[in-house]
Amino acid sequence: MQVLIKRNGMKRSKFHRERKEKLASMPIYEARAVAKYIRISPRKARSVANSIRGKNVSEAFTILEFSPKKAARIIKNVLKSAVANAVNNHGLNEENLYVYTCYVNDGPRMKRLWPRGRGSADIIQKRMSHITVIVRDREAEKAANEEKK
């Protein structure tokens, strides 16, 4: 007899089936890359992520290349990975790709103690980020939208 573990209020097999269906329904003209547990403050990384959203991939690489921020180097690597996923896994053309969305979520926080006067201490929170970049093919997206009409 198979014992099913509940997750998010539903049985595990149903959870995995729904997840598989959701992934299958994702458009084939889209590729993503995720970097998790990156040691940078989400607030600092979001300003860089906002600057490349909606831009062509080549333009986004140029923006990230000349940005002096630490987050730019990290997001550039994630973008490079998303483009490689699009080209290798989906066979998309790199010239037609654009940054569909780029967002930064909070990760866990490392807590450190900072000694203060009279034997007390303050807690310092070292924040982490989860960075997601999704690229899409403009031409394939237009063709898919025309087919729906």
From Swiss-Prot:
Domain of life: Bacteria
Keyword tRNA processing on entry: no
Keywords assigned: Ribonucleoprotein, Ribosomal protein, RNA-binding, rRNA-binding
GO biological process, one term: translation
UniProt xrefs under InterPro entries: Ribosomal_uL22, Ribosomal_uL22_bac/chlpt-type, Ribosomal_uL22_bac/org-type, Ribosomal_uL22_CS, Ribosomal_uL22_sf
Disulphide-bonded residues: none
One cellular component term from this protein's GO annotations in UniProt: cytosolic large ribosomal subunit
GO molecular function annotation: rRNA binding; structural constituent of ribosome
Function statement: This protein binds specifically to 23S rRNA; its binding is stimulated by other ribosomal proteins, e.g. L4, L17, and L20. It is important during the early stages of 50S assembly. It makes multiple contacts with different domains of the 23S rRNA in the assembled 50S subunit and ribosome. The globular domain of the protein is located near the polypeptide exit tunnel on the outside of the subunit, while an extended beta-hairpin is found that lines the wall of the exit tunnel in the center of the 70S ribosome.
Subunit structure, as described in the record: Part of the 50S ribosomal subunit.
Similarity section: Belongs to the universal ribosomal protein uL22 family.
Protein known as: Large ribosomal subunit protein uL22
